[in-house]
From Swiss-Prot:
Organism field: Arabidopsis thaliana (Mouse-ear cress)
Tissue specificity statement from the Swiss-Prot or TrEMBL entry: Expressed in roots, leaves, flowers, stems, siliques and seedlings. Observed in zones of cell proliferation, the vascular system and floral abscission zones. Expressed in the guard cells in stems, in xylem vessels and parenchyma cells surrounding the vessels, in the cambium and in the phloem, but not in the secondary xylem.
One of the Pfam families matching this protein, by short name: Alpha-L-AF_C
GO terms, biological process: L-arabinose metabolic process; xylan catabolic process
Function: May be involved in the coordinated dissolution of the cell wall matrix during abscission and in the secondary cell wall formation in xylem vessels. Prefers arabinoxylan, but may also use pectic arabinans as substrates.
Induction: Not induced by hormones or during leaf senescence.
Residues in the signal sequence: 1-33
Biological classification of the source: Eukaryota, Viridiplantae, Streptophyta, Embryophyta, Tracheophyta
Name of the protein described by the UniProt record: Alpha-L-arabinofuranosidase 1
Keyword Glycoprotein in annotation: yes
Length: 678
């Protein structure tokens, strides 16, 4: 074969190879296209300037109720339980639980009596030490308090212990933080005083610095000096509470990360009580902590010293940047009611409570606030008259008396009725009506449309309590959270009538689970968020954003989706949120119209997905991040894109927009025209 023939043959072979490769490549592309089915649904989003409406600034917030030891033994950082010995009742001698003795009955005798110097809490503890330095155990005898299922003491941290004491003789009292059985001392200081110094009640304080860590520690008060000592109002607080305001840092931060726009407090059924004698009464929760009598919350069956009181709730709201919504008792409990003709003392109590928050420092109740260290008024624009009381005999009559009195004194305050106005108009005036829903996952998912047909006239809706409960919920399942996410998307779409919404309950101490499920789970030293908590985080940017007009087209009955636009650090985003409630993966086309071409940026766009391998998966102390959102780069951020929604998932897609680049002519001294990009 000559050289020319060889070159020709080689060229033919190369050409054949290239043609064959192209054919194979095209065939593979066809196969890929066939294996990647067309999207089952399309979300059409109108992002033009006129394509949306504002979402209320207040839409998503939180509801704090004293339930599950959410406050006492939780958010409120006080380590001592039953610090004033009042929990056992006013008849003495009384039960001092959870206090107990160090030593035995041959060396120490303790009992309560009514000798306290505080008029509202007369119970004190008398400790008769029967041994002396020779006969007492080396560590002394006395009493200890284990706190709320153990005190979390951390090495290097400081704890302020305060107590009131008196005695008939000299005292030499050791104040110690120890391990749960008292065998190891974590920190200790002495209070030494002469008989003349402690012949009358006197406040003593010590600062303890822990030299070791123990999440199940206890506080001990011990002595080897024979004689009688009276003790009252014992407090142990970490020095490093949030802003020094008494809130446990890690729990406060979990709450703050939701970015709530309001906080409803202090209940709930906690406000009502099983009986009015045990209802939360705000006046008993203000002033110096040692003067607060505390009370037994008979609905949730535990004692609170009320260190977390009326003042602290307003402080919490301010610290978290949320509008306070105060729920007060309207003369009605679960089992007894005050008739309307006799309701005025309760009305005056509500007016006084508003004055405490908003009044001038020279006003009657504003001055009480000022004495607590707060000269400036708190902000208070919302109050709720009762909780879940609409069907009670005297509610409507009582409500009108409260409404008229509050509007006369504070016409700007927005008033929330307990009666549901979503299906029928209210028969009384209100700015908002309260709506509560606890149900199964499938029911709540279907309630995505709950407010679609609600009249836009009259009061706005406040969905102040909602959650999936029952077997679908477990103790905080993925399934429950997905139904809640769909429900919230529905509230977001109906935010022209729904102005506020909050999940319930917020906190649970695992040692006293009175309600199930809850958003944030904790014990003395650890915490985690349930999937329902993480759903709340998806909606943090919705309040005050713009709801974009969107339409979901397709055959799927398991998908719910919406779109908002919002700003962060001066940048514009479109956020697509989608719930796939079904067991199969779904492809969803997202078609955004009304934007300039090529406005989306891949860099800065992201997707966030909440899902797991099993729809009933939960988080736990051993696996706190088993079901949490996972964030990644959104590589195909375009006006027309297809996204994959995993089975049983909640996804958000944040599309970063940038200003369109326009070519503008400019001129210089030359005769040629130049362009610049702006």
């Amino acid at each position: 074969m000559d050289m020319e023939s060889w070159k020709l043959l080689r060229s033919v072979c190369v050409l054949s190879f290239l043609l064959g490769s192209c054919f194979v490549y095209q065939s593979l592309r066809v196969v890929d296209a066939q294996e990647d089915p067309k999207p089952a649904v399309t979300l059409q989003v109108d992002a033009s300037n006129g394509g949306g409406r504002p979402i209320p600034e207040t839409l998503f917030g939180i509801f704090f109720e004293e339930i599950n030891h959410a406050g006492a033994g939780g958010l409120w950082a006080e380590l001592v339980s039953n610090r004033g010995f009042e929990a056992g009742g006013q008849n003495t001698p009384s039960n001092i639980w959870p206090w107990s003795i160090v030593g035995d009955h041959s060396s120490i005798y303790v009992a309560t009596d009514r000798s306290s110097c505080f008029e509202r809490n007369k119970i004190a503890l008398r400790m008769d030490v029967l041994c002396d330095s020779k006969g007492c155990p080396s560590g002394g005898v006395g009493v200890y308090n284990p706190g709320y299922w153990g005190m979390n003491i951390e090495e290097g941290k400081k704890y302020k212990v305060a107590l009131y004491v008196r005695s008939t003789g000299d005292i030499d009292l050791s104040v110690s933080l120890t391990s749960s059985n008292g065998s190891r001392t974590l920190a200790s200081e002495k209070i030494i005083a002469s008989a003349s110094d402690v012949s009358k009640w006197i406040k003593k304080e010590v600062l303890l610095e822990a030299k070791a860590t123990d999440p199940s520690a206890r506080l001990q008060l011990t002595t080897t000096k024979k004689g009688s000592i009276w003790i009252d109002q014992v407090s142990a607080m970490p020095v490093d509470t949030h802003k020094g305001h008494g809130f446990r840092n890690d729990l406060f931060q979990m709450m703050a990360d939701i970015k709530p726009r309001f906080i409803r407090f202090p209940g709930g059924c906690f406000v009502e009580g099983e009986w009015l004698s045990n209802a939360f009464r705000w006046k008993e929760t203000v002033g110096p902590w040692e003067e607060r009598p505390g009370h037994f919350g008979d609905v949730w069956k535990y004692w609170t010293d009320d260190g977390l009181g009326h003042f602290e709730f307003f402080q919490m709201a301010e610290d978290i940047g949320a509008a306070p919504i105060w729920v007060f008792n309207n003369g009605i409990s679960h089992n007894d009611e005050v008739e309307t003709a006799s309701i005025m003392p309760f009305v005056q109590e509500a007016l006084d409570g508003i004055e405490f928050a908003r009044g001038d420092a020279n006003s009657t109740w504003g001055s009480v606030r000022a004495k607590m260290g707060r000269q400036e008024p708190f902000e208070l624009k919302y109050v709720a008259i009762g909780n879940e009381d609409c069907g009670k005999t005297y509610y409507r009559g009582n409500y009108i008396v409260f409404y008229d009195a509050i509007k006369k004194a504070y016409p700007d305050i927005k008033i929330i009725s307990n009666c549901d106005g979503s299906s029928h108009p209210l028969d009384h005036p209100a700015d908002y009506y309260d709506y509560h829903i606890y149900t199964s996952a499938s029911n709540l998912f279907s309630m995505y449309h709950q407010f679609d047909r609600t009249s836009r006239k009259g009061p706005k809706a406040f969905v102040s309590e909602y959650a999936v409960t029952g077997k679908d919920a477990g103790t905080g399942s993925l399934l429950a959270s997905l139904a809640e996410a769909a429900f919230l998307i529905g509230l977001e779409k109906n935010s022209d009538i729904v102005e506020m919404a909050s999940y319930a309950p917020l906190f649970v101490n695992t040692n006293d689970r009175r309600w199930n499920p809850d958003a944030i789970v904790f014990n003395s030293s650890h915490l985690y968020g349930t999937p329902s908590y993480w759903v709340q985080r998806f909606f943090a940017e919705s309040s005050g954003a713009t709801l974009l007009t969107s339409t979901l087209k397709g055959n799927s009955t398991s998908l719910v989706a919406s779109a908002i636009s919002w700003k962060n650090n001066g940048k514009d985003y479109i956020r697509i949120k989608a719930v796939n409630f079904g067991a199969n993966s779904e492809n969803m086309q997202v078609l955004v119209t009304g934007l300039d071409p090529n406005v989306m940026r891949v860099s800065g766009s992201k997707k966030t997905v909440l899902t797991s391998t099993n729809v009933m998966d939960e988080n736990s102390f051993s696996q706190p991040e088993k079901v949490v959102p996972h964030e990644s780069l959104l590589e195909l951020a375009e006006e027309d894109m297809t996204v994959v929604l995993p089975p049983h998932s909640f996804s958000s897609f944040d599309l970063l927009k940038e200003s369109a680049k326009i070519r503008m002519p400019i001129s210089d001294s030359s005769s040629h025209q130049k362009t610049t990009t702006v």
